[in-house]
Amino acid sequence: MQKEPMSQFGYDKLAAELKDLKDNQRPAVVIEIDTARSHGDLKENAEYHAAREKQALIESRIAELSDLLARAQVIDPSSYEHDSVKFGSSVVIMDLDTEKESKYTLVGICEGNLDKGYISIASPIAKAMLGKKEGDDFKVRLPKGESEFEILSINYEPLKF
């Protein structure tokens, strides 16, 4: 079973979503199904079929979240050195073709937020950076083609969700 690294915030966010699905959304959709069923012929009852589809989506998400939380590995990135790129590292990189600098922080798969520079540890660029040190170059295949980057700095900055 592959562990999924995430911060305590990410774990709590997923756990809250799972609790809401189980405690609120699942019972509500059961009521919707019962109400729609009381309207008669199920073959031509669009309300009933929509509620059943909604129920399937909720059950699917519950299964997905349950699996993810079972595999969660909560990591406190402040507890270790950031001498190489790891989960929780803030990394400044430079595109060697354009000399454009970008800063990214590696976070769990459910915590990505590109506006804040938070990228999933499962993203192609994060995977290519893992284990690298300052001054190292790495290549990554992006939608626009292969690009080469240099790691300018690595440090830890507390996450601000």
Swiss-Prot record:
A GO molecular function held by the record: DNA binding
BP-aspect Gene Ontology terms: DNA-templated transcription elongation; regulation of DNA-templated transcription elongation
Q: What is this protein called?
A: Transcription elongation factor GreA
Q: What Pfam families does UniProt report for this protein, alphabetically?
A: GreA_GreB, GreA_GreB_N
Family membership, please give it: Belongs to the GreA/GreB family.
Q: What Gene3D superfamilies does UniProt report for this protein, alphabetically?
A: Transcription elongation factor, GreA/GreB, C-terminal domain, Transcription elongation factor, GreA/GreB, N-terminal domain
Residue runs in coiled coils? 45-73
Query: What's its job?
Result: Necessary for efficient RNA polymerase transcription elongation past template-encoded arresting sites. The arresting sites in DNA have the property of trapping a certain fraction of elongating RNA polymerases that pass through, resulting in locked ternary complexes. Cleavage of the nascent transcript by cleavage factors such as GreA or GreB allows the resumption of elongation from the new 3'terminus. GreA releases sequences of 2 to 3 nucleotides.
Instruction: State the UniProt keywords alphabetically.
Output: Coiled coil, DNA-binding, Transcription, Transcription regulation
Q: Which NCBIfam families match?
A: greA, PRK00226.1-2, PRK00226.1-4
